[in-house]
From Swiss-Prot:
Protein name, per record: UDP-N-acetylmuramoyl-L-alanyl-D-glutamate--2,6-diaminopimelate ligase
The protein's role, per its UniProt record: Catalyzes the addition of meso-diaminopimelic acid to the nucleotide precursor UDP-N-acetylmuramoyl-L-alanyl-D-glutamate (UMAG) in the biosynthesis of bacterial cell-wall peptidoglycan.
Gene3D superfamilies per the UniProt record, alphabetical: Mur ligase, C-terminal domain (3.90.190.20), Mur-like, catalytic domain (3.40.1190.10), MurE/MurF, N-terminal domain (3.40.1390.10)
Cofactors (names): Mg(2+)
Binding site for ATP: 108-114
Molecular function as annotated in GO: ATP binding; magnesium ion binding; UDP-N-acetylmuramoylalanyl-D-glutamate-2,6-diaminopimelate ligase activity
Organism: Ectopseudomonas mendocina (strain ymp)
Binding locations of meso-2,6-diaminopimelate: 378, 402-405, 453, 457
Top EC class of this enzyme: ligase
SUPFAM superfamilies: MurD-like peptide ligases, catalytic domain, MurD-like peptide ligases, peptide-binding domain, MurE/MurF N-terminal domain
């Protein structure tokens, strides 16, 4: 519904009707409000003339440092500190959708996608239709539209929530990235439950230090009117977070601390998944899931904690857990049986790679083989750390490309190589498709092959161009060739 400009922006005198909001001048249509803010890569104010030419009814722009400007056909509104107000402005325009939804924010270095996807499935099964916003896209489980960022821009977030609400969502599970928190993309949302999975090295190219990275994550747990905090007590930063005094209810979960609100004992892992006894102040029960790995058991506890925080009963929660499926590219299994078992996972940090390799070790009868790379234009410091993890936990290690972006792939490989004690034992192959094909071709039926880093991604980004590429497709084709060769 169009809204008068002076209702949307108190500083505006004009009541011109605004049809839509946009931060991108190329998307402006007649009647829109163009929001021009300085960004990390470019200043939106340089595109004001373009927005006006495309028919913008009004332009709100950052007043600080702005050059004098004039437009005949559009209302210009200078706003000091506009970037910090974008979420609130968009919230007003789209009818404050988060207030009408059960909004669950999930943050952490690893596990955000799995927890949000599992939580949405569980809520659907419990009769509360749940939307999803995150790395795999936005929408509903099984029908996601891919987006560019884990957490969309402030206007995109509010528009997405309004769209999900209109489509019938009563709840939304949202991945909340540290960038999103630091840049105020979710500033005016009303979260009911906040979930913390873990904190390990990532994004230091942006945050500069682990302290700044952790501080960005911590913002979500001091949110106004938050009802419940669900925190992983097996994580050192999680324990710090849990000790901070807030009005919201705390549900801590742990695989090792029997004093936690949610505690798993007697966990049994096999090729079919996990079975464990769940101990809570509300009683005990048996948790069953077909997901692999200890870290996925931790993810399931996060889901249970969020559902308890939303006042679902333990018995009804435990009934739906066996029906939950892991998201695409997260510990996704291909082959197995009389063929090599290939596991495709998004692990792209040292901690995530460690967890995946440790999770797969009990399933190995032959060799545990790890193929990985590191993304270009990202934290260089983690590259040798990932090499050390792979060398320590896998029997065989192959290194290849993983979204080199604008960097020279040879430089990325050199950074990784520095982390190996015995680099002469490692295969280095540029061309990820070729590496996957050769790796699977030489595998034995008893081997477990972990393809780490890209997971669900359907592209390889090289010098700014995203070329179609999928680990899942490449692995399936290579497994078919392996089967033909061993027939």
């Amino acid at each position: 519904m169009p809204m008068p400009l002076n209702q949307l922006l108190p500083a505006a005198e004009s009541g011109v009707l605004i049809r839509e909001l946009t931060l991108d001048s190329r998307k402006v249509r007649p009647g829109d409000l163009f929001l021009a803010v300085p960004g990390t890569q470019q200043d939106g104010r340089v595109h004001i003339a373009d927005a006006v030419a495309r028919g913008a009814a009004a332009v709100a722009f950052e007043a600080e440092g702005a050059a004098p400007m004039h437009a005949e056909s559009a209302v210009l509104v200078p706003v000091k500190g506009l970037a910090g107000q974008l979420s609130a402005i968009a919230g007003r325009f789209y009818g404050e959708p988060s207030r009408a939804l059960h909004l669950i924010g999930v943050t952490g270095t690893n596990g955000k996608t799995s927890v949000s996807q599992l939580l949405a499935q569980a809520l659907d099964l419990l009769g509360e239709r749940c939307g999803i916003v995150g790395t795999l896209g936005t929408g509903f489980h099984g029908a996601l539209e891919q987006g560019k960022h884990t957490t969309p821009d402030p206007v995109g977030v509010q528009a997405t929530l309004a769209s999900l609400k209109q489509a019938g969502a009563r709840a939304v599970a949202m991945e909340v990235s540290s960038h999103g928190l630091d840049q105020g993309r979710v500033a005016a949302l009303e979260f009911d439950v906040a979930v913390f999975t873990n904190l390990s090295r990532d994004h230091l190219d942006y945050h500069g230090s682990m302290e700044a990275y952790g501080a960005a994550k911590a913002k979500l747990f001091a949110w106004p009117n938050l009802r419940c905090r669900v925190i992983n007590l097996d994580d050192a930063f999680g324990r710090e977070l849990a000790q901070q005094a807030h009005d919201s209810r705390l549900i801590g979960y742990s695989l090792s601390d029997a004093s936690a609100f949610l505690y798993c004992s007697e966990a049994q892992f096999d090729d079919h998944g996990v079975r464990a006894r769940l101990v809570t102040p509300r009683g005990e029960g048996v948790l069953r899931s077909n997901l692999l790995g200890r870290f996925n058991l931790s993810n399931l506890l996060a889901v249970v904690g969020a559902l308890l925080g939303m006042d679902y009963g333990l018995d009804e929660i435990l009934k739906v857990l066996p029906q939950l499926q892991g998201p695409a590219g997260r510990m996704q299994r291909l082959g197995g049986g009389d063929k090599p078992l290939v596991v495709v996972d998004y692990a792209h940090t040292p901690d995530a790679l460690e967890k995946v390799l440790e999770a797969m070790r009990p399933h190995v009868q032959g060799r545990l083989v790890c193929l990985f790379g590191c993304g270009g234009d990202r934290d260089r410091g983690k590259r040798p750390l990932m090499a050390a993890v792979a060398e320590r936990l896998a029997d065989v290690v192959w290194v290849t490309d993983d979204n080199p972006r604008s960097e020279d792939p040879a430089q990325i490989v050199a950074d990784i190589r520095a982390g190996f004690c015995a680099p002469e034992q490692v295969q280095f192959i540029h061309g990820r498709g070729d590496a996957i094909a050769r790796l699977i071709a030489q595998a034995e039926a008893a081997d477990v092959l972990v393809l780490a880093g890209k997971g669900h991604e359907d592209y390889q980004e090289i010098t700014g161009v995203r070329h179609p590429f999928s680990d899942l497709i490449e692995a399936n084709e290579a497994l078919a060739a392996w089967e033909a060769a061993h027939a």
